Amino acid sequence: MIKQRTLKRIVQATGVGLHTGKKVTLTLRPAPANTGVIYRRTDLNPPVDFPADAKSVRDTMLCTCLVNEHDVRISTVEHLNAALAGLGIDNIVIEVNAPEIPIMDGSAAPFVYLLLDAGIDELNCAKKFVRIKETVRVEDGDKWAEFKPYNGFSLDFTIDFNHPAIDSSNQRYAMNFSADAFMRQISRARTFGFMRDIEYLQSRGLCLGGSFDCAIVVDDYRVLNEDGLRFEDEFVRHKMLDAIGDLFMCGHNIIGAFTAYKSGHALNNKLLQAVLAKQEAWEYVTFQDDAELPLAFKAPSAVLA
């Protein structure tokens, strides 16, 4: 039986909030089978839980938030959610003593390291996957995103940024997902933004944690970070990282082929909601035998060591 995963032990890290610029303590806790992914704000009394749920997602200019029925929100969840998807973590409680998850270096890599440091534990309960049965597509002007049936998890993402720092040959990235491929090829890709936008937001008391330490920063001509890019195509790789996190908002790894053109958090979420709303387009599946499991979800040695 392919089993659900959680953490072996509690781990903690500190970072800076993208919005407030203040120190945030992040605590990751193991959780029992069928708990799902729960984000929790401990700065509120009593603490407020936000279960990962496609219908609770709100996309703001700066980040992805989860919002509850009382309009209370937790912000900047997307990169940690991508790390959970990458390592196939089904059950976890994520606590922060702030309204947001720390931005760390703007990628998912610090969260991957934290999860691996906690260790991955298998629970004696079958892991549920969402398997795509029919093609579902959503559009917004010339932007689109779609899922097709596929025995694995493949991603094909194209951006269209007209900027001197982004070569036209580096605007598309495609991969067959696996935990190893995610860790090596995607997790280290950082978010990005224009210097002028960051300066404008900070002048209005927003994005106070934004800096060269947590993003690729560009002006009209070039990348301003001293160390440059981690990959020539880091921009599109980060958009794929975002998509992996967005699509895991249903709390389950997806078996299907994802293709997107100029998509972002809002359209990725619209696709996920469109799939889930169409009952005949998907099904829950479990696997009794490792041999039946798509290669995409075979546990790498690093994860279950």
Curated annotation (Swiss-Prot):
Effect in UniProt of substituting D246A: 1800-fold decrease in activity
The record's free-text note on cofactor binding: Can use either Fe(2+) or Zn(2+). The metal cofactor can switch between Fe(2+) and Zn(2+) in response to metal availability. Metal switching may be important for regulating the LpxC activity upon changes in environmental conditions. Has a significantly higher affinity for Zn(2+), but exhibits higher activity with Fe(2+). Can also use Co(2+), Ni(2+) and, to a lesser extent, Mn(2+).
Keyword entries, A-Z: Hydrolase, Iron, Lipid A biosynthesis, Lipid biosynthesis, Lipid metabolism, Metal-binding, Zinc
Catalytic activity: a UDP-3-O-[(3R)-3-hydroxyacyl]-N-acetyl-alpha-D-glucosamine + H2O = a UDP-3-O-[(3R)-3-hydroxyacyl]-alpha-D-glucosamine + acetate
Effect of E78A: 700-fold decrease in activity
Any GO BP: lipid A biosynthetic process
Family per record: Belongs to the LpxC family.
Name of the molecule in the record: UDP-3-O-acyl-N-acetylglucosamine deacetylase
Classification of source organism: Bacteria, Pseudomonadati, Pseudomonadota, Gammaproteobacteria, Enterobacterales
